């Protein structure tokens, strides 16, 4: 792709066209160096399913669809809050939410396949949001989750795993088992 700053737009456009039945642009990208991009791998997997899932080409449309199917009387949990844009959006429907983050950025380097996001990327400069109905637990998951889950917690309606790193996501998932039941919706943002 000539201009890397337009890479994600081109990938998304090709995926939308593919989803609408025009496979030419997507197939061309699959024959290029962006074949290993995490989005391309995700799109390829989704398009290979016998019954492709409903796709939402916007984080906000996706969250709207999740909220329509969720139990609003339960809280949501979010692992990886950063600047709390998703958290604030979810609070439009839920009465309470728990957010977990260091607010100082990634705790370790993150290899994204085309480069590395350095430890400290996605920092909120230590600024913890103040949102009515929200409770924020500050620190690494390894340090905070054993303490947080040492007490009974309400079953989750939605859990948004947006920690980016596999190590952080698997830690959060492992500790969250007590708040997951058959009605809990799990969201896995890239990791």
Model segments located where?
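Alpha-helical repeat scaffolds
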Residues: 1-2, 23-35
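Short helix-capping/linker turns of helical repeat alpha-solenoids
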Residues: 4-6
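"A position-specific structural signal for the A-helix of alpha-solenoid helical repeats
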Residues: 8-16
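Short acidic/polar alpha-helix capping motifs at helix-coil junctions
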Residues: 27-31, 50-53, 141
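S-adenosylmethionine/decaboxylated-SAM
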Residues: 37-39, 43, 64, 68-191
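Conserved SAM-binding loop and adjacent beta-strand
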Residues: 48-61
């Amino acid at each position: 792709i000539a201009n890397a700053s337009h890479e994600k737009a081109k990938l998304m456009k090709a995926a939308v066209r593919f989803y609408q039945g025009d496979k030419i642009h997507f197939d061309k990208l699959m024959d290029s160096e962006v074949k290993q991009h995490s989005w391309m791998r995700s799109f390829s997997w989704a398009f290979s399913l016998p019954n492709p899932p409903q796709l939402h080409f916007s984080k906000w449309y996706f969250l709207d669809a999740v909220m329509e199917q969720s139990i609003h009387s339960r809280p949501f949990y979010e692992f990886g809050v950063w600047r709390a844009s998703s958290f604030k959006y979810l609070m439009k429907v839920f009465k309470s939410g728990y957010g977990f983050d260091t607010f100082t950025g990634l705790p370790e380097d993150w290899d994204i396949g085309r480069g590395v996001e350095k430890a400290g990327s996605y920092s909120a400069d230590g600024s913890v949001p103040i949102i009515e109905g929200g409770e924020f637990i500050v620190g690494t998951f390894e340090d905070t989750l054993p303490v947080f889950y040492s007490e009974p917690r309400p079953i989750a309606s939605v859990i948004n795993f947006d920690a980016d790193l596999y190590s952080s996501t698997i830690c959060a998932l492992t500790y969250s088992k007590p708040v997951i039941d058959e009605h809990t919706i799990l969201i896995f943002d890239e990791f």
